[in-house]
Swiss-Prot record:
The keyword Ligase applies. ATP binds at S14, L15, G16, K17, G18, I19, D71. Residues 1-265 are annotated as: Amidoligase domain. The gene is pyrG. Belongs to the CTP synthase family. This is CTP synthase. InterPro entries: Class_I_gatase-like, CTP_synthase, CTP_synthase_N, GATASE, GATase1_CTP_Synthase, P-loop_NTPase. Catalyzes the ATP-dependent amination of UTP to CTP with either L-glutamine or ammonia as the source of nitrogen. Regulates intracellular CTP levels through interactions with the four ribonucleotide triphosphates. It comes from Alkalilimnicola ehrlichii (strain ATCC BAA-1101 / DSM 17681 / MLHE-1). The active site is at C378 (nucleophile), H514, E516.
Length: 540
């Protein structure tokens, strides 16, 4: 019998509901429960796949090929579970489903309304995402008071009434600001946020109060009094310098005990030794390296959330602090590659569109010529191929058809047909819709014996997640192989190139897939660990 924990937020956005939910999930998992996690996003987009990274941050890709909110990345990194498209629903997706049902006549000619049709669809989606787990944590995006969130809040209010207090609880995340001029913390924003939530019909059982410093006991009692929440259920969550400390912070305050008691669960004690080891490794590094990340979304580092975390995970594995130097690829186009001087490795991540692509090509050339370790991901592989074709293989004018309609040498082109892991053929053209029309999700990749990729992974076949429309053009395979480029990873049908290497380089590897989506703080990822070790060796 699944029990539900609904997590809402108030006062301001970006309080860290996703990390709080994921931290609670990993504590409950450590106490022997199976845990599922779902994010409900109020925006009307069907998914974030076509949203600008500056608007939304990273698009996180699941094993089954869903383009989802970046919070699902936090869920997978904290909780040992695999997310699917059933773990992220948007207003657009909910309405799309309801409208399809109306067109099929499933509502028997009735008037389709927010209540009950939209709220029923939300409840059905929540139950589907729960997947019969012992505990289902449901995060409601946005802030209480937003008009977009109202259908979701109404749906969870109804579920609370239907399930009863023994099977669900409500946890509300708020901000308790410190006013420097007054020298005191202010509880009024939290009081008003809970008042707004109660006006909808939801009484929170637990308050998690974000604060920059310790909340005095007197203020906690005041919050409890005005919000009708038990004093012990007013939990402080102070700012920390490392998000992987949060599970221990919440556990020390007994959040998991409060949850277990309110849901009528008797559980064994939690062991958080894994997280203690993670934090200890990050706080006591044996050295440090600096890695240049050359992209065009560097003003908003959330656009590279999983990459940032993957490099930190590799730092945990190697016991080195990884300093990331963000470099705007357009800056390299304007001012040259001086910004790369002194780095221990270069990473070029994925991206879309022509802006800044020549700067990424310059970064790949810099790494190749100066023997600096290089890791290219998705577009980072494509620019490495373009650079090699132009400057080593002598294919003047080599480019991708994504950026130039008719290049002299289209070494990268649109994938018009490929086979999915289920054996079905996907076809696309330049006129296809942008949303959901890429090669998406986990796909097997066969690695060549004796290659760097095979050495790094330690096996012949790996499975990694993809998100791209363009691929290497196999017509140029022989020419580039003759020039010294090695193609060391292939799709399972050997039609698509997945990994390229430069054998005469100390460490140069580029992949079409996104390994950052499967890296976790406790287990890391072999590709990032090997990349950071190469950076350490280069640093000397």
């Amino acid at each position: 019998m699944t029990r539900y924990i609904f997590i809402t937020g108030g006062v301001v956005s970006s309080l860290g509901k996703g990390i709080t939910a994921a931290s609670l999930g990993t504590i409950l998992q450590a106490r022997g429960l199976s845990v599922s996690m779902t994010k409900l996003d109020p925006y009307i987009n069907v998914d974030p796949g076509t949203m600008s990274p500056f608007q939304h941050g990273e698009v996180y890709v699941t094993d089954d090929g869903a383009e989802t909110d970046l919070d699902l990345g936090h869920y997978e990194r904290f909780v040992r579970t695999t997310m699917t498209r059933n773990n992220n629903y948007t207003t657009g997706r909910i309405y799309e489903s309801v409208i399809r049902k109306e067109r099929r006549g499933e509502y028997l000619g009735g008037t389709v309304q927010v209540i009950p049709h939209i709220t029923d669809e939300i409840k059905r989606s929540i139950q589907q995402g729960a997947d019969d787990a012992d505990i289902a944590l449901i995060e409601i995006g946005g802030t209480v008071g937003d008009i977009e969130s109202l259908p979701f809040l109404e749906a969870i209010r109804q579920m609370g009434a239907e399930l009863g207090r023994g099977r669900c609880l409500f946890m509300h995340l708020t901000l308790v600001p410190f006013i420097g001029a007054a020298g005191e913390m202010k509880t009024k924003p939290t009081q008003h946020s809970v008042k707004e939530l109660r006006s909808i019909g939801i009484q929170p059982d637990i308050l998690v109060c974000r604060a920059s410093q310790r909340i005095p006991e007197e203020e906690r009692r005041k919050i409890a009094l005005f919000t009708n929440v038990e004093p012990r259920a007013v939990v402080s969550c102070l700012d920390v310098d490392n998000i992987y400390k949060i599970p221990e912070v919440l556990h020390r305050q007994g959040l998991d005990n409060i949850v277990a008691e309110k849901l009528g669960l008797e559980l064994p004690p939690a062991s958080l030794q894994d997280w203690q080891r993670v934090v200890e490794a990050m706080q006591n590094p044996e050295g440090e390296v600096t890695i240049a990340m050359v992209g065009k979304y560097v003003d908003l580092t959330d656009a590279y959330m999983s990459l940032n975390e993957s490099l930190r995970h590799a730092g945990i594995q190697t016991r080195h602090r990884v300093n990331i130097r963000y470099i705007d690829s357009e800056e390299l186009e304007r001012e040259g590659t001086h910004a790369l001087d002194g780095v221990d490795a270069v990473l070029v991540p994925g991206g879309f569109g022509e802006r800044g692509v020549e700067g990424k090509i310059l970064a790949a050339r810099y790494a190749r010529e100066r023997k600096v370790p290089y890791l290219g991901i998705c577009l980072g592989m494509q620019v490495a191929v373009i650079e090699y074709a132009r400057n080593v293989a002598g294919l003047e004018g080599a480019h991708s058809t994504e950026f130039t309609r008719h290049p002299h040498h289209p070494v990268i082109g649109l994938i018009t047909e490929w086979m999915t892991d289920e054996g079905t053929v996907e076809q696309r053209s330049e006129d296809s819709d942008l949303g959901g029309t890429m090669r998406l999700g986990a796909q097997p990749c066969r690695l060549t014996e004796g290659s760097l990729a095979r050495q790094v992974y330690g096996k012949d076949v790996v499975e990694e997640r993809h998100r791209h429309r363009y691929e290497f053009n196999n017509h140029y395979l022989e020419a580039l192989e003759a020039a010294g480029l090695r193609f060391s990873g292939w799709s399972h049908d050997r039609k698509l190139v997945e990994v390229v290497e430069q054998p005469d380089h100390p460490w140069f590897l580029a992949c079409q897939f996104h390994p950052e989506f499967t890296s976790t703080p406790r287990d890391g990822h072999p590709l990032f660990a090997a990349f950071v070790r190469a950076a350490i060796a280069h640093r000397g």
